[in-house]
């Protein structure tokens, strides 16, 4: 720029980089890009900043809708149920013969057809309760004990000793959490009331106090029982072990090459930074372009069977980010036709990338909109290849594209208007799309199950919680049972359990693994010898096992490094063995800071 701020002759000729001449180079970002960066700020600092940004009226409304109202409903249920039961019996007993039978049949029919949705609601409430009370209390106690004891033992502790310590701390944490819960029950019990009368419905406000006391007792009882159950189950099950050796590849049999990427965090701007890393991480999407370029060359040299991306395709689930991801993939049709994707927490649970303190109310269209963006992308990438599960028959149903065809107009209308009515109608559609199954090509081939492991959260700061719904797990197991000779990749975003490696900080150990991870591993146990779980989420390069189940954790080819530092991903080779799926030594693909060769 000249002295008056105009472009000089040399600048007009294209020889000057205006950004580099600016006082603040916009490509380098600024403090606003570090608002939620865990790489440059502590969780305490981020949490402190959130307090000044939170909308407290909105927080109060969210607290009422998500905690207080469910607690009152939960606590009032025994009172209202008693009233309803007595009144219903009185009326049924007054109806002669056939009338009584018809009423009972009607009640049974409503229960039968409403049961699947009711189970979803009950399960979501149960695991919401776990994520609010049981999981934080139990996991906090367990991980604090582990962190302290592993710190005392030091790095010389062997893997077998660490496994025993982790089993013992699980049992101890369950006992401590149960004792705290019993103390809460003792405090609330004098204010409880478990029977009601019809007259109580005329003055419902007088039920609030006993209902809240009932809720405290019920929640605490759940905490006591669940903590003990989790502690015993976690202590008794096989502990995670790091894999030191891999299976040999010389045996005859079918092999599959699977490129496993995760957490690519596509941004919608050429110089955009990521939420987690801020200025401590890379800008733009150059690393993704480099990874796809390398994959193209590797595929041309030796064909890949699958390109699996286990979540966090985008940084915040915005439309521009999905557009950038699909544009990059569209340029490489040979990769696109064998790519499989599943949702991560950044694809679904970031309410506002610029403001971590923002809340999504249960009535907000934002969450459903992010789900529909992800579903639309999954349909475009793999809809004609993967199939949904017919839960009533316990076997594979139509392809994802066929399943969504009757709902395309509703999805488009909701994306255009954000209508609450349309949003409610799309809730069950989203839930029933999982697990998505790429069936094995032969009876003894390799199938891929794509799960949604994201718990429903309404706050960016708690976006990372994970959960595999029991209905989804049962659907997966029924398909695996139906294809009795096949091998399986069970793909999800969240890590099943905390890694069996020492952590530098306590914050690294808490709140990001599956809430019900140990339960899910036990469900997979009958199929463990012919299944491999693949996930991402924490950007940790780790391969291990839990009993017979092999587990592969993918590093991020994008995160955990600046632009001038290398990253990597892996190509895994799987081989069919005698009744088992073998994992051969992986091939590491390094993404250099500037190279393209």
Predicted region positions:
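Extended active-site neighborhood of metal-dependent phosphoesterases/phosphodiesterases
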Residues: 243-247, 324-475, 557-559, 563-564, ...
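Beta-strand-turn-beta hairpins that frame and shape the catalytic cleft
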Residues: 247-259, 266, 431-450, 484-487, ...
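Active-site environment of divalent metal-dependent phosphoester hydrolases
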Residues: 267-270, 315-317, 345-353, 456-459, ...
